[in-house]
């Protein structure tokens, strides 16, 4: 059998570097933490796996170990793991187990592992109207007024009920822009961005169809684009998951929990090989994405 460790070395932007206590790319060791961008997500996970390998006699193992390290995970993820998986499928090369070092811990390392992730769809909408003076309502076509009933439908919609592995699909409005900044001038157009994180109970295509039907039912003139940037995946816990759970209990002294929470990961690509997947990594608070985009990414 083949066990693959999947990781990424690309990182999110640092933000203002003067807000960092240490140079974000120095890897500064303060005696307690290694400081630097990407230590938690997820260079630390890669370092841990390499360190573990250096302490065992790999020649004595009855299975093979591989590394799949990408530099295209934080961004559009168009040329990283997805391309490797396409090549592996073409070659009919089989991966049996995959360990992903993404941050998964809530409080104490190992208290949570992931065996799935929700899907994600980004939607950009432009509502078309007609600009005019607020004193002459008959001469304007206010896109803000037009979008309100659409938003009401959108926010009240029960997309699904979730299931035993996934919470119900959720929606968040992330950007809305309209107007020229004056009190007495209505906007010409309105721009809206929103995101849905969806379970295995619904597809990205079904969400797209619902949104388009809402727009049609309200008679809204519009331009809309959809980007299904991640499909949900679920890895049925079997032998590998059992081994990871037992190892955590042996080392840490507690039973871990299994979840499908969090954002997207490259697990969505590697899952297409049919391998069993476990995501196990450091505490959320060690990396920028989970500390309100603050500086001082660090890992002990």
Regions found by a protein language model. Give the residues of each.
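Single conserved hydrophobic/aromatic residue that forms the stacking wall/gate
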Residues: 290-300
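Active-site metal-coordination/substrate-binding segment of hydrolases
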Residues: 2-66
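Acidic-enriched catalytic cores of C-N bond-cleaving enzymes acting on peptides and small amides
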Residues: 134-177, 185, 198-223
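Glycine-rich, charged/polar anion/phosphate-binding loops
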Residues: 107-114, 158-159, 175-181
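A short beta-alpha structural unit
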Residues: 171-179, 195, 199, 223-241, ...
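Active-site-adjacent substrate-binding region
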Residues: 151-159, 232-277
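Short pre-catalytic strand/loop immediately N-terminal to key active-site residues, enriched for Gly-Thr
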Residues: 30-40, 254-259, 287-289
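Fold-level recognition of mixed alpha/beta catalytic cores in primary-metabolism enzymes, strongest
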Residues: 39-40, 44-53, 57-153, 289-292
């Amino acid at each position: 059998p083949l066990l693959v460790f999947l990781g990424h070395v690309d990182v999110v932007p640092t933000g203002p570097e003067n807000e960092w206590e240490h140079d974000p790319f120095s890897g500064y060791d303060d005696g307690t933490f290694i400081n630097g961008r990407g230590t938690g997500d997820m260079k630390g996970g890669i370092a841990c796996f390499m360190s573990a390998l250096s302490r065992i006699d790999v020649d004595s193992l009855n299975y093979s170990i591989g590394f799949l390290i990408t530099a295209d995970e934080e961004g559009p993820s168009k040329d990283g793991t997805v391309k490797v998986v396409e090549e592996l499928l073409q070659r009919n090369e089989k991966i049996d187990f995959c360990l992903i070092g993404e941050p998964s811990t809530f409080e104490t390392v190992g208290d949570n592992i992931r065996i799935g992730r929700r899907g994600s769809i980004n939607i950009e909408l432009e509502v078309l109207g007609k600009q005019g003076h607020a004193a002459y309502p008959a001469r304007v076509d206010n896109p803000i007024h037009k979008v309100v009933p659409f938003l009401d439908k959108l926010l009240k919609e029960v997309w699904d009920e979730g299931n035993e592995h996934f919470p119900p699909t959720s929606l968040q409005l992330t950007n809305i822009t309209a107007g020229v900044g004056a009190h007495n001038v209505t906007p010409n157009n309105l721009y809206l961005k929103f995101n849905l994180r969806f379970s295995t109970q619904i597809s990205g295509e079904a969400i797209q169809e619902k949104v388009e039907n809402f727009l049609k039912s309200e008679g809204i003139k519009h331009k809309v684009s959809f980007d299904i940037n991640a499909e949900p995946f679920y890895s049925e816990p079997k032998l590998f998951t059992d081994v990871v759970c037992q190892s955590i209990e042996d080392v840490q002294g507690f039973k871990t929990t299994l979840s499908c929470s969090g954002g997207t990961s490259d697990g969505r690509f590697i899952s297409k090989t049919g391998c069993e997947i476990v995501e196990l990594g450091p505490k959320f608070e060690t990396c920028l994405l989970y500390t309100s985009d603050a500086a001082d990414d660090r890992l002990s």
